[in-house]
């Protein structure tokens, strides 16, 4: 009996049916992998290839870490993804952007999920040290009372998985509620607000597009203005936008969460000051001057006043200026004040200029 050639009409019919069946099962498989956290959060994957994950839209969580979004140009922060090394590769840490040596608050060892470990004087939090089986979170050790609060969180590990988030919330947020569930914890209810690494902003379970993605080496700034009740986010010391309003008289804390295995974040700045006339004037000056200008450099201020403002309100006057992004594309800056070290807790060189953030 002669064998029918594969380019015949019958074979084309069979192959088309197989393709339709595969297309119908593909969304269900992706949904199942996301629900259980396979591969994307450090678990074993039942797929033979990561090819499909590479085609996911930017807003969809992925097993592929986000790259190219670092505050600095250190090679370790912008290395292309390598599937044979992720997520277990060890990357040297840089110190870029870590100028402060006074911190108004750090992470609270008594208000954290079980899958978290603190280091660097409680400024660095590591999630899921071996493998991930859910969502872990931690809260700052100080309530954000009246005044102006600004802090920065640096992503010190590959950023990937179901979600890694930065935000705020009340003391009613249950940090261990989803320890066996992969989810976007911050903003899941009315008690918290969270910005995801995918660029989505979440509150009351509602998600909206807010920013571009962020990855390892990115610095996420958060400004809570309790006087006006406004929450603003920054990325790599550039303003993203207002995330929430009507937050006056709320008892809020800084929060972060992660579902990714062997992930970590670090507080590199935490400041607070009263809503004084001095602050309001500095904030207005920052609005009037071009975004790329360092207010302290261009204004004809006496040296003493310039130093006082730099110490107390430098984060207001310099945010968004070229000086705040001096490590971008500047290899000499990276070498002198942000050189590699085996530990991200190693202090910078003595000759590096440090900006103190003191209470007013």
Swiss-Prot record:
It comes from the Eukaryota. SUPFAM superfamilies: Concanavalin A-like lectins/glucanases (SSF49899). Residues 332-346 have a biased composition (Polar residues). SMART domains: SPRY. Residues 264-315 form the SOCS box domain. Keywords: Nucleus, Ubl conjugation pathway. One of its GO terms (cellular component) is nucleus. It is found in: Nucleus. GO terms for biological process: negative regulation of cGAS/STING signaling pathway; negative regulation of epithelial to mesenchymal transition; proteasome-mediated ubiquitin-dependent protein catabolic process; protein K48-linked ubiquitination. PROSITE patterns: B302_SPRY, SOCS. Pathway: Protein modification; protein ubiquitination. Residues 21-54, 322-350 are annotated as: Disordered. CDD domains: SPRY_SOCS3 (cd12876). One of its GO terms (molecular function) is ubiquitin-like ligase-substrate adaptor activity. Residues 84-274 form the B30.2/SPRY domain. The SOCS box domain mediates the interaction with the Elongin BC complex, an adapter module in different E3 ubiquitin ligase complexes. Belongs to the SPSB family. This is SPRY domain-containing SOCS box protein 3.
């Amino acid at each position: 009996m002669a064998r029918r050639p594969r380019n015949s009409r019958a074979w084309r019919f069979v192959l088309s049916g197989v393709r339709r069946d595969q297309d119908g099962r593909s969304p269900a498989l992706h949904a199942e992998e996301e629900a259980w956290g396979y591969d994307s959060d450090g678990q074993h994957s039942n797929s033979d290839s990561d090819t499909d994950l590479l085609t996911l839209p930017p807003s969809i969580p992925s097993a592929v870490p986000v790259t190219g979004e670092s505050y600095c140009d250190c090679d370790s922060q912008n290395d292309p993804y390598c599937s044979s090394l992720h997520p277990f590769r060890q990357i040297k840490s840089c110190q870029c952007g870590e100028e402060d040596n006074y911190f108004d608050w750090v992470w609270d060892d008594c208000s954290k999920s079980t899958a978290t470990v603190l280091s660097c004087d409680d400024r660095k939090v590591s999630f899921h040290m071996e493998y991930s089986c859910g969502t872990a979170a931690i809260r700052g050790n100080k309530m954000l009372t009246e005044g102006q609060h600004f802090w920065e969180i640096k992503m010190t590990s590959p950023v990937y998985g179901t979600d890694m988030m930065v935000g705020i919330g009340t003391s009613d947020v249950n940090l261990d509620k989803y320890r066996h569930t992969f989810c976007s914890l911050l903003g899941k209810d009315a008690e918290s607000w969270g910005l995801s690494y995918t660029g989505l902003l979440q509150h009351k379970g509602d998600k909206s597009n807010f920013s571009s993605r962020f990855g390892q080496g990115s610095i996420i700034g958060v400004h809570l203005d309790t006087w006006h009740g406004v929450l603003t986010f920054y990325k790599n010391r550039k303003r993203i936008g207002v995330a929430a309003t009507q937050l006056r008289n709320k008892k809020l804390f800084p929060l972060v969460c992660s579902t990714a295995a062997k992930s970590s974040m670090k507080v590199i700045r935490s400041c607070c000051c009263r809503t004084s006339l001095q602050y309001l004037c500095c904030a207005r000056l920052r609005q009037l001057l071009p975004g790329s200008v360092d207010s302290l450099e261009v204004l004809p201020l006496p040296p003493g006043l310039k130093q006082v403002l730099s110490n107390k309100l430098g984060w207001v006057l310099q945010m968004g200026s070229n000086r705040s992004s001096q490590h971008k594309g500047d290899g000499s800056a990276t070498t002198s004040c942000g050189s590699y070290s085996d530990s991200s807790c190693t202090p910078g060189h003595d000759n590096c200029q440090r900006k103190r953030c003191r209470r007013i």
